[in-house]
Amino acid sequence: PERPSGARPTQVTKSITNMKATKESKYNALFNKLIDVNDLLNRLIEIAKDLEYPIFRKNDKYPINLNIWGIRSKSTCTKHYNDVIVMFYERDFNIWECMVFEATTDPSNLNLETPVNNKGCAVLREGVHKALWKIGKHKGQYKALVQANPCQVIRDNNRDDKIDITDNTDFGMFGINLHRASSWKVSDEIGLYSAGCQVIKDVNQWNDIIIPLFDKAIGKGTQSYVLINEMDLDL
């Protein structure tokens, strides 16, 4: 996909999943804080410029040149969905579509306390993960974004319910997917749905909005991912 031109958006179109159209979350303070989608998108583009992260823009080859960014909450709670995933693309020159979803970018407390890997839980490292995903099936069950290329994770192996960001890193194919939580209910608690994957809380948003977007934007290609921290936003 095309590298950013450096231009900042002058207008952001409002979508049915922007902050103003979504009820306040009980546990996700970060989600509630991101009221103005236009300001959020401008801030993400500023961060991308400062850190030399890619911002994909519309072009002839990619009419929907999708950007997916995760924002990890500064909260250490891993029981509830307290992070967000932002999906945005340039619909026309400097006219952007921006959608923000409640999510987790961390393993849940249950998986941290009882990791499935003897090295410890995989916590996706913040930064750019180029061509991380492709469309596939999560655990062979339903359409999702599945890991297509190796990535770097942090191994958290002290078996408490808090995320520990250390230098204990690992690199490889770990099944770090982007998928939904429950297929039949929307719960505030992560449960066992994340052992390191990026997980969208709301199955209705997943089925009605996200999967159709993936089909149009990604197809048989790959999708990069940027993960930052709430503190990067300087809110």
Name each model-derived stretch.
Residues 20-191, 205-212, 219-223, 230-232:
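Cell wall/extracellular polymer interaction/catalysis modules
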Residues 1-14:
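Short, positively charged low-complexity motifs
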Residues 11-18, 23:
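N-terminal compositionally biased, intrinsically disordered segments and leader/signal-like regions
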